[in-house]
């Protein structure tokens, strides 16, 4: 069905909790995903895996679960759809991950957030009408924001994605924030990404 409608990429958006890295049936997930990768190729599709923060658990050998997935199921059977919010929230540098998997990230989820202990990078471009809104303690560990209103260095992420051959930047707004509707958040994010100072 995906091939019929002209879809090029299909993505595993998440896995059951008993199949995440370090869980009891992680090996089952790896086996099934490899099979899906082969099936996708037979239909001219590219299978991708979308991460969350729980893939950044350390495996017994010290490797992150996310890296274990892509080592075990190498390209071209599986590519990554990096969710840049969850890379950062897990304590890693999303620019470094874009560089690490350059050439193997056809799509990304661009998402901004604030969180306890997270500091906005110096000199991040603040577009008129899109001010940085600090974290409120009652919002939990990660509070989502429209792109450009959180801690992410969005211009650096856009540049790294472009350099690595990313085809699609997908704005994701899991929940509305700052009193804006989901559509208002999405428009704010898209307007920020279209700004020439962000998307050079």
Language-model features and meaning:
Residues 6, 60-62, 66-200:
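Histidine-acidic metal/acid-base catalytic patches
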Residues 1-80, 100, 183:
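Active-site acidic/histidine proton-transfer and metal-coordination neighborhood
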């Amino acid at each position: 069905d995906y091939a019929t409608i002209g879809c090029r990429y299909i993505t595993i958006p998440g896995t059951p909790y008993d199949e995440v890295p370090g869980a009891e049936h992680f090996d089952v997930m790896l086996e099934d995903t490899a099979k899906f990768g082969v099936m996708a190729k037979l239909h001219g599709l590219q299978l991708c895996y979308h991460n969350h923060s729980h893939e950044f658990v350390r495996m017994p050998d010290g490797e992150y679960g996310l890296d274990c997935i892509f080592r075990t199921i190498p390209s071209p059977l599986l590519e990554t759809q990096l969710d840049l919010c969850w890379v950062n929230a897990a304590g890693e540098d999303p620019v470094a991950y874009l560089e690490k998997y350059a050439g193997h990230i056809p799509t990304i989820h661009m998402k901004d957030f604030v969180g306890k202990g997270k500091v906005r990078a110096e000199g991040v471009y603040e577009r008129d009408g899109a001010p940085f809104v600090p974290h409120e303690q009652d919002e939990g560990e990660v509070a989502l924001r429209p792109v450009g209103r959180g801690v992410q260095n969005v211009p650096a992420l856009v540049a790294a994605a472009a350099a690595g051959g990313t085809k699609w930047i997908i704005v994701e707004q899991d929940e509305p924030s700052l009193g804006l509707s989901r559509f208002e958040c999405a428009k704010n994010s898209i307007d920020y990404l279209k700004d020439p100072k962000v998307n050079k």
